[in-house]
Amino acid sequence: MAGYATTPSPMQTLQEEAVCAICLDYFKDPVSISCGHNFCRGCVTQLWSKEDEEDQNEEEDEWEEEEDEEAVGAMDGWDGSIREVLYRGNADEELFQDQDDDELWLGDSGITNWDNVDYMWDEEEEEEEEDQDYYLGGLRPDLRIDVYREEEILEAYDEDEDEELYPDIHPPPSLPLPGQFTCPQCRKSFTRRSFRPNLQLANMVQIIRQMCPTPYRGNRSNDQGMCFKHQEALKLFCEVDKEAICVVCRESRSHKQHSVLPLEEVVQEYQEIKLETTLVGILQIEQESIHSKAYNQ
């Protein structure tokens, strides 16, 4: 006699509607999301917080890697600029260190004659150029260096200080903007944290709980071939975690980078291996039996 499927009673159907698809228990402070499905406030909040934390950690890791690369390049340029300025400064100091402090333009009274300041600087610049030609004239062109007055070095150093010594530092990453949340039941995406309290459902759950303390999960029960978390058919097999998963699990962070196979292929391969192992065992037993009979004869 062929069996027939039993239909749940109206009370069982009512109980099933009062069960959260995430925790598989009666709703606690139920809220409705944009697609119309209901969940416990604590369940959906915890799910969102976990995803937000993972997203933020990934963005911070990417930002730190970019900052490390930029810092290495900036430090190379900074170090080169410092060495160039120090080298030129030392060359300038050695070039003009032979000038005595007594070589000042003083008047007959022994007091500095400030009227001759312009003449003093012009003549000193000419002497510096002559000294530079004297010291560097005999060098090969590829060994020559530029020698500048101290004032020019300091002026150029101040202009490039902000650009080279203090490279642009990007501000820390801002908090991630609201992303997309996929409903565990219908997988429809919508803006996160867009839910509203469902007071009518909360009152109904309270009445049902008094009548039936233990919830009836019906099709939401973790029967064989159904995902306990997403209530989807287990159609895939994760080769890394060695477990059957649903299509929603496949898109989650825990399995997104893993290699998966259709569950049917894995089951078929397993059955073939099991059958082959069984046949090999039977053949070995038969061979041992034949050898035993031949030995006894």
UniProtKB/Swiss-Prot annotation:
Which family does this protein fall into?
Belongs to the TRIM/RBCC family.
Miscellaneous comment: Arose via a partial duplication of the TRIM41 gene, followed by independent loss or pseudogenization of TRIM52 in multiple mammalian and primate lineages.
Its UniProt entry gives the catalysed reaction(s) as: S-ubiquitinyl-[E2 ubiquitin-conjugating enzyme]-L-cysteine + [acceptor protein]-L-lysine = [E2 ubiquitin-conjugating enzyme]-L-cysteine + N(6)-ubiquitinyl-[acceptor protein]-L-lysine
**In the UniProt entry, what is the domain comment?**
The RING-type zinc finger domain is essential for its E3 ubiquitin-protein ligase activity, ability to positively regulate the NF-kappa-B signaling pathway and its antiviral activity.
Q: Name one GO cellular component term.
A: nucleus
Q: Does the keyword Lipid biosynthesis apply?
A: no
Instruction: Write down a Pfam family by its short name.
Output: zf-C3HC4_4
PANTHER family given in the database record: E3 UBIQUITIN-PROTEIN LIGASE TRIM (PTHR24103)
The function of this protein is: E3 ubiquitin-protein ligase. Positively regulates the NF-kappa-B signaling pathway. (Microbial infection) Exhibits antiviral activity against Japanese encephalitis virus (JEV). Ubiquitinates the viral non-structural protein 2 (NS2A) and targets it for proteasome-mediated degradation.
Q: Which GO terms describe its biological process?
A: defense response to virus; innate immune response; positive regulation of canonical NF-kappaB signal transduction; positive regulation of NF-kappaB transcription factor activity; protein autoubiquitination; protein ubiquitination
- What drives induction of this protein's expression? Up-regulated by Golgi stress-inducing agents such nigericin, trichostatin, tetoposide, campothecin and brefeldin A. Up-regulated by IL1B/interleukin-1 beta and TNFA/TNF-alpha.
Region feature Important for rapid proteolytic degradation by the proteasome, mapped onto this chain: 72-167
Q: Pathway listed for it?
A: Protein modification; protein ubiquitination
Could you say which residues bind Zn(2+) here? C227, H230, C249, H255
Quote the protein name from its UniProt record: E3 ubiquitin-protein ligase TRIM52
Q: Which organism is it from?
A: Homo sapiens (Human)
ZnF start-end (RING-type): 20-62
The answer to keyword Zinc applying to this record is yes
What gene, per UniProt, encodes this protein? TRIM52
Q: How is it modified after translation?
A: Autoubiquitinated. Polyubiquitinated. Undergoes extremely rapid proteolytic degradation by the proteasome.
Where's it found, cell-wise? Cytoplasm; Cytoplasm, Cytosol; Nucleus
User: Keywords, A to Z?
Assistant: Antiviral defense, Cytoplasm, Metal-binding, Nucleus, Transferase, Ubl conjugation, Ubl conjugation pathway, Zinc, Zinc-finger
Q: Where are the zinc fingers (B box-type)?
A: 222-263
Give the taxonomic lineage as stored in the record: Eukaryota, Metazoa, Chordata, Craniata, Vertebrata
Record-linked InterPro entries: TRIM/RBCC (IPR050143), Znf_B-box (IPR000315), Znf_RING (IPR001841), Znf_RING/FYVE/PHD (IPR013083), Znf_RING_CS (IPR017907)
EC number of this enzyme:
2.3.2.27
Q: Which domain of life is it from?
A: Eukaryota
